[in-house]
Amino acid sequence: MQLCGFEVGIDQPLFLIAGPCVIESQEMAIETAGQLKEITTALGINFIYKSSYDKANRSSNKTFRGFGMDEGLKILDEVRRQVGVPILTDVHTEAQVPHVAAVVDVLQTPAFLCRQTDFITACAQSGKPVNIKKGQFLAPGDMKQVVQKAKEANGGADTIMVCERGASFGYNTLISDMRGLAIMRETNCPVVFDATHSVQQPGGQGDKSGGQREFVPVLARAAVASGVAGVFMETHPDPAQALSDGPNAWPLSKMKALLEVLVDLDRVVKKAGFIEHTV
């Protein structure tokens, strides 16, 4: 699949989607994107910057949601202009799709909305690549139907990615079943693993979600060893002070060290091939 000027897939080098959970300021967005670009350029990793203009599914209405669509899109457009990186952001309603698609390079659908047919259809018809997050409530094999809806809407174009972000396992807990990554490859779409939301503890701090960022490298390594097209990681210069999803954000200062390991793993795994495809 062609994505932002490069090829992605199970037979292509690992690519990265990364950035702060929510836009906190234009200055921080530009600085973070610049540092990530420097890191990924040095490591030869294709990179897409991610940040949200609105966190529409916060646990509480007392927590920070973001700048809103209009101001947020202006900031993301400025990040692309100044830093020179492609941009991905979430879209939350059908009405937002044309406005967001006019600015960013890749649309992302929230996991909670993966079963909303009209919403998925609108995103797929936008003309932009779409990263569809698998719902925490959905079996990996059920993503075939989600992809079918999207492909029927976009005329069968290769513009759809699917993203694993953990499965609900009791209250306030997510787990990652690495078999799901192989199952989702059967959609014939690039598979992305969200290593940071997979360690989230939804609603685990009462009015906001908790997380266990120490397990981000554990799951990221396992996913890359299983075989994925890309990795998604939210990162922050100071996760303890992040306005959204700080407990599961990976520290920006540790991003290069983690990516070095993931790139090495990716090369080994993809060079060896996938013997599971032979049985």
From Swiss-Prot:
Catalytic activity entry: D-arabinose 5-phosphate + phosphoenolpyruvate + H2O = 3-deoxy-alpha-D-manno-2-octulosonate-8-phosphate + phosphate
Any one annotated GO CC term: cytoplasm
Recorded name of the encoding gene: kdsA
One Pfam family in the UniProt entry: DAHP_synth_1
Pathway linked to the protein: Carbohydrate biosynthesis; 3-deoxy-D-manno-octulosonate biosynthesis; 3-deoxy-D-manno-octulosonate from D-ribulose 5-phosphate: step 2/3; Bacterial outer membrane biogenesis; lipopolysaccharide biosynthesis
UniProt-listed Enzyme Commission number(s): 2.5.1.55
Location of this chain's protein in the cell: Cytoplasm
Protein name: 2-dehydro-3-deoxyphosphooctonate aldolase
GO biological-process terms attached to the record: keto-3-deoxy-D-manno-octulosonic acid biosynthetic process
UniProt entry keywords in alphabetical sequence: Cytoplasm, Lipopolysaccharide biosynthesis, Transferase
Coiled-coil region list: none
Family label: Belongs to the KdsA family.
GO molecular function, one term: 3-deoxy-8-phosphooctulonate synthase activity
